[in-house]
């Protein structure tokens, strides 16, 4: 299954869970926890085979949920939109080691993406390691990840 398809399934599941949460839906921290856990599980599933892969899913889900909850607690929709657009631009065009920053003028939250090593994975996809730093209400959170291009260029 393509990564994009998996992400769409996760996003759909998250929105359905929000709808079940009653009027007003889930708060930002709950959404961040849910999406972080799902994203972490997806990332963890890319490593190992058999039981090792299950461990990767579990560890990825746990770490993603914790980090997602912390970040989601303070980020609003504009923060998320700015971070997403900046991430895409940084991973596609920025030189390794450079910081590409976003800043929300309405609340002072900001962050930056630092793309690092570019490589080809075992299936031939071009991938890039990155560091994402987010400062919400003066508190810094840092996450590390890998992003890979799909065969269709996404």
Curated annotation (Swiss-Prot):
Keywords of the record:
Cell outer membrane, Lipoprotein, Membrane, Palmitate, Signal
| Main location class | membrane
In this record, residues modified by a lipid of the kind N-palmitoyl cysteine are 20
Q: Name one Pfam family in it.
A: Rick_17kDa_Anti
Topologically, how does it sit relative to the membrane?
Answer: Lipid-anchor
Superkingdom of the source species:
Bacteria
Q: Where is the lipid attached (S-diacylglycerol cysteine)?
A: 20
Q: Which GO terms describe its cellular component?
A: cell outer membrane
Q: Where in the cell is it found?
A: Cell outer membrane
Q: What is this protein called?
A: 17 kDa surface antigen
The organism named in the record is Rickettsia rhipicephali
């Amino acid at each position: 299954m393509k990564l994009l398809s998996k992400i769409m399934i996760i996003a759909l599941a998250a929105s359905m869970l929000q709808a079940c949460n009653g009027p007003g839906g889930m708060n930002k921290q709950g959404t961040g926890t849910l999406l972080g856990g799902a994203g972490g599980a997806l990332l963890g599933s890319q490593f190992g085979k058999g039981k090792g892969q299950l461990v990767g899913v579990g560890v990825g889900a746990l770490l993603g949920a914790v980090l997602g909850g912390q970040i989601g607690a303070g980020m609003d929709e504009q923060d998320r939109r700015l971070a997403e657009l900046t991430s895409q631009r940084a991973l596609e065009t920025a030189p390794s080691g450079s910081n590409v920053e976003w800043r929300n003028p309405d609340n002072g939250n900001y962050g930056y993406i630092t793309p690092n090593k570019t490589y080809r994975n075992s299936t031939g996809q071009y991938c890039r390691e990155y560091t994402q730093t987010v400062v919400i209400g003066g508190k810094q959170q840092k996450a590390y990840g890998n992003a890979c291009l799909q065969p269709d260029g996404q």
